[in-house]
Amino acid sequence: MSAPSRFDRGHTDDLMTFLSASPTPYHAVANAAERLEKAGFRQVAETDAWDGTSGGRYVLRGGAIIAWYVPEGAAAHTPFRVVGAHTDSPNLRVKPRPDTGAHGWRQVAVEIYGGPLMNSWLDRDLGLAGRLSLRDGSTRLVNVDRPLLRVPQLAIHMDRNVTADGLKLDKQRHLQPVWGLGDTVRDGDLIAFLEDEAGLARGEVTGWDLMTHSVEPPAYLGRDRELVAGPRMDNLLSVHAGTAALAAVAASGAGLPYIPVLAAFDHEETGSQSDTGADGPLLGTVLERSVFARGGSYEDRARAFAGTVCLSSDTGHAVHPNYAERHDPTHHPRVNGGPILKVNVNNRYATDGSGRAVFAAACEKADIPFQTFVSNNSMPCGTTIGPITAARHGISTVDIGVAILSMHSARELCGADDPHLLANALVAFLQP
C-alpha cells in the first residue's frame, strides 16, 4: 500500500488537454472513462447483473458518468465518499431543423443552452461537436474542431449607442451563426456535412445533439503564467480533478474505510431534471446496486447512505478587481488561494458546520489552504447540484469548488495552481 502521489502544475497542463478534447458532455465522459480504464476501471452496463467483487467500475449514460472503486473486503454497509460535478456548460445548441439563412448568408439555427454571457460568443471562431444518433440505434461522437461558425456582431457604425446604452441582443434574431454563402437554403446540408466529417454514409444520421464551442485552445496567461484562460472550466475543471483523484486513490492500493465515487452529471446548467441530471435517480440507483451486489439488504443500504458524504465541486466566483463591491465585504476568494467552501444559509448551497469540518480536515491532510465564499446579501445566490443531491438521496453534502473569473463566458479564467490544489483536496477527502 502507498499514498497517492501529489498533483502539481503538471495536473493543470493535463486539464488544458482535457478541456480541448471535451467540447461536449459526451466527449467529457468518454475522456473521463478512457482515463479510468487506464487506471484499471471497467465499464458495466445498467442492463446487466452486477457482481460484488472488488475493483473499479463505471457507468456511462449520455453525458453523465458514475465511477466507483470497491476496496478488497468492503462490507455491504460501507459508506461512500462522493465527488459530485457536472459536465455541461452554457453554449449555443443546434435546433432540429438547423439549415437556415437570409440575404445570401447560410446560417445554422441555434437555441441558447443555460445562461451564457452572450457577448462572449460574438465574433468568436466556433466549432461544432456532439453526438449523432444513427439509423441502426448506435451513436457516434463528432467534433469539428476548426473555425466553422461565427456570430458576427453589428458594426458600431450601425449601432452608435451601443457603448452608452449597453449591448442588447435579441435571442432569436441576433445569435444565429453564419457558416457560408448561398441564396438557397437546403434542408439536410449541415447533417450531410457532419456525416462526411464522421465518415458516415448519407442518411445514416437520424438524430443529433450538437453544440458550438470556441476553437481557441486553453492557454497560460500573465507575465508569470499564473493564470489559465480556457473554455468550459465550469465545470470540467471539477470533472477532471475528480477523475484524477479517483484514479489516484484506486491506484494507491491503500486501505479505504469508504467507497470512493465520482458522479459527473449532465444538465446542471438547466436545472438537473433529466435522467442524466443530479435530480434524476442515476446516482442513487448506482449506489444501491453496489450495496446489493455485495450481498447487502435494504438495512445495509440505509446504513451506507447514512454514513455517506458528498463534496459537490463546482466553480465559484473569485473577487473581481473591477467589481469588488459585488462580493461580500468580508469574503473575497482569490485565484490561486486554494479551493473555496461555499456557504448560504438559505440552502442554495448544501454546506453546514459539519460539512465545513469534513472539508477542513481534507484540506489539512492535503496541506493546502482553502477559502470561503458567501454571496453579497444584496445579490441573489446561485446554486449547484449540492442541495439537490442532499435532498434527493438524504446524504450529507458540502459545496466546494475553484474560484474563477468570467463564469459562463465562452472563455473563463482561473489560477494555474488551483486545479491541482483542488485535486489534492479531493484525494484527501476520498482517502481520509
Locate predicted features.
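N-terminal hydrophobic/helix-forming segments and targeting peptides
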Residues: 1-432
